[in-house]
Amino acid sequence: MYLPVDFHTPLLYLAVVGILLVFALPLGISAFFRWRTFRADANGLQTYARRRDLRIQSGLSIGLVVLAIASAFTALIGWQKSTNNLVSNVETRYAVTDVRVTNWNGTWAQVDLVTDDGVKHDDLSAYTGDFYAPILQGTMAGNSQLSAEELGIKLR
C-alpha cells in the first residue's frame, strides 16, 4: 500500500564516499608529486618499473575518485527516491496537500505540510512505521510531542 522509504542506505553511501576520498586524495597527491619528480629525472633514472608504479598509483587514485562519485550519485538518487516516496505516503495516509521535506537523517525526516482545511504545520517529524506507513508527530504551543491526530491532521 505504501512505497518503500529508506533513508539509511543513502547515508551509508555517503560514508563510503568519505572513506574512498580519505584514501584517494593522499594517493593522488602523492602520485602527482612523484610524476613531477619522475619527469625531471634524467633519462637513465626513468625506469620502466618506476613508470609502472606511477601508473598503478595514479590509476588507483582515479578509480577511487570515480567510485566515490558513483557512490555520491547513488546516494543522491536514493535520497531523492525516498523523499518522493515519503511525500507520496504522507499524502496517501493523511488529508494533506503541499508536503515538503525540509530535513532528514537516517531514521526520520522533518516535513512542512498544509492540511486540506488550509492549516499549515511546520517542522513535523515523519517516521515510518510498519510497511512504510508514515507517522507524523509535532509540537504545538510548547507541548511535548503530539501525534498527527492530536494536531488536527485527519487520516484519509
Task: Tell me what each language-model feature is.
Residues 1-44:
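Membrane-embedded alpha-helical segments of integral membrane proteins
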Residues 34, 95-98, 152:
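Short, flexible coil/linker elements and helix-boundary hinge sites characteristic
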Residues 41-54, 132-138:
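Cytoplasmic juxtamembrane regions at transmembrane-helix boundaries
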Residues 49-83:
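Internal/C-terminal transmembrane anchor helices
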Residues 52-53, 97-107:
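Cytosolic juxtamembrane regulatory segments of multi-pass membrane proteins
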Residues 76-98:
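Alpha-helical transmembrane signal-anchor/signal-peptide segments
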Residues 102-156:
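Extracytosolic and intramembrane catalytic regions of membrane-associated proteins
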